[in-house]
Design a protein with these regions (language model features):
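Single conserved hydrophobic/aromatic residue that forms the stacking wall/gate
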Residues: 1-8, 12-14, 389-397
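N-terminal glycine/serine-rich phosphate-binding loop of ATP-dependent small-molecule kinases
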Residues: 5-9, 13-168, 173-177, 206, ...
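Glycine-rich phosphate-binding loop of actin/hexokinase-like ATP-binding domains
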Residues: 73-77, 82-108, 173-189, 221, ...
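Gly-rich Lys/Arg/Thr-decorated short loops/hinges at beta-loop-alpha junctions or inter-strand turns
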Residues: 108-123, 199-206, 370-385
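Hydrophobic alpha-helical scaffolding
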Residues: 120-128, 209-215, 237, 269-272, ...
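Active-site neighborhood for divalent-cation/phosphate handling
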Residues: 184-226
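P-loop NTPase catalytic cores that bind/hydrolyze ATP
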Residues: 320-338
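A contiguous, well-structured pocket-lining segment that forms one wall/lid of small-molecule binding clefts
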Residues: 335-391
Length: 397
């Protein structure tokens, strides 16, 4: 065994100047057969993390590019969004999302903390629920793009602290009371199989570190992406909108962070035509201030709704609802077009001069889109849900 290990290390060292490698018994079992099949030539896939020994996670016969994919997951309280990436090219293959199955046990994170405290097997139930949801999501996105789960070697998570703890099976009850201590605030790299995620058996999970309190890895990722500290003489306010809003105020290299519960209004819940951000969801809205006619963009279609090619190109995904960014723009555009008064109430057809404004049961609504399958309107209750959301975020800011 020692001689074989030395030979393996010498081959990789001499060919690629990589010092020292390791691999699991599962990978080692296939080595001899794949060497012979490849005429004594093989291609290995190495997983390498700084300050660790490189690990062989896959072997192919001969000399070829090993299909290698990774998944980035935003684990939200209401929805789970996944982006599939080709690790060889760095290109994004596709995205997909599902509702977080934990929502049946509580709409927000604090209700899930309460569930863990009140139910004997509450933590295990919530952990199993989210792991099953992640496995379903990765299976669906892999199937959609014709990729084997065995070709996915890394999965990266960002989440708020409570979702982070529930993912790892860590009791979050201490996060339900001051001073909100985290069990783990650093990054973590573990085998996917150790927490029940079904990918390649040698694949790894990497969790982005949380900042602290209720400001999580999702907010940390926003800072990494936007890098507001580079804008030396500018004050920047960043808001990560979700069931919890995380707010970051940056001035030079000083960055202040806080979070507040705001509810799931912008993630598909509490909005009459609301849905998560997925193909078919209206994500952009513009309303002509003179004609009061809307135009919009749908996730999965490049054209605006007033362009000629829209009807043909949108047929594959359809128009199914409106997501968070869409409802924000719709409310703003309705106000600019004179469809809303200062209190956020939708005017009647006579008041606005638009037949799209209709009255029903002593309340008004604005028709955004309709066809023979679906009718999507913005109602006064939708406006109120958005106002409650933004007031919570504004108070925190």
């Amino acid at each position: 065994h020692i001689m074989r290990r030395r030979q393996r290390q010498m081959c990789i060292r001499d060919s690629w100047n990589i010092q020292g490698v390791t691999c699991s018994v599962r990978v080692l079992k296939d080595l001899q057969e794949k060497l012979r099949r490849g005429n004594w030539g093989i291609t290995v896939l190495l997983y390498y993390k700084e300050n660790t020994v490189p690990e062989i996670v896959d072997i192919h016969s001969g000399y070829s590019e090993i299909p290698a994919f990774g998944v980035a997951i935003d684990l939200g309280s209401t929805s789970i969004a996944a982006t599939l990436c080709d690790l060889n090219s760095g290109k994004i293959v596709g995205s997909m999302g599902i509702m977080n199955p934990q929502i049946r046990y509580g709409e927000d994170v604090m209700s899930r903390v309460s569930y863990c405290m009140m139910e004997e097997k509450g933590l295990a139930t919530l952990n199993n629920s989210v792991i099953q949801g992640i496995n379903e999501l990765t299976r669906k996105i892999a199937e959609k793009h014709g990729i084997k789960l065995d070709s996915i070697f890394e999965i990266v998570f960002v989440a708020n602290p409570i979702m982070h703890h529930l993912l790892l099976g860590i009791d979050p009850k201490e996060l339900g009371q001051a001073p909100f201590p985290l069990a783990l605030s650093d990054s973590l790299t573990i085998k996917s199989k150790d927490i029940g995620i079904i990918l390649n058996p040698e694949s790894y999970v990497y969790t982005v570190p949380c900042i602290g309190g209720h400001v999580g890895a999702d907010a940390a990722s926003v800072l990494i992406a936007e890098q507001p500290q580079k804008l030396k003489d500018t004050t920047t306010l960043l808001i990560d909108i979700g069931t919890n809003a995380e707010i970051l105020l940056a001035k030079g290299e000083e960055i202040f962070a806080c979070s507040c519960p705001t509810g799931p209004a912008l993630e598909g819940a509490q909005i009459s035509a609301g849905q998560r951000a997925a193909p078919g969801a209206i994500e952009r809205v513009r309303i002509d201030p003179i004609t009061k006619e809307p135009r919009f963009k749908v996730i999965g279609c490049e054209q605006w709704s007033n362009e000629k090619e829209f009807s043909e190109n949108v047929s594959g995904v359809g128009v199914t609802g409106i997501c968070g960014s869409g409802i924000i723009e719709a409310v703003a555009e309705m106000r600019l077009a004179g469809l809303l008064d200062a209190n956020g109430l939708i005017g009647s057809s006579a008041q606005t001069g638009s037949n799209r404004c209709t009255s029903s049961e002593r309340t008004n609504s604005y028709l955004l889109y309709s066809d023979n399958k679906v009718s999507l309107s913005i109602t006064n209750m939708d406006i109120r849900a958005c106002l409650l959301y933004t007031s919570d975020a504004a108070d925190d800011a």
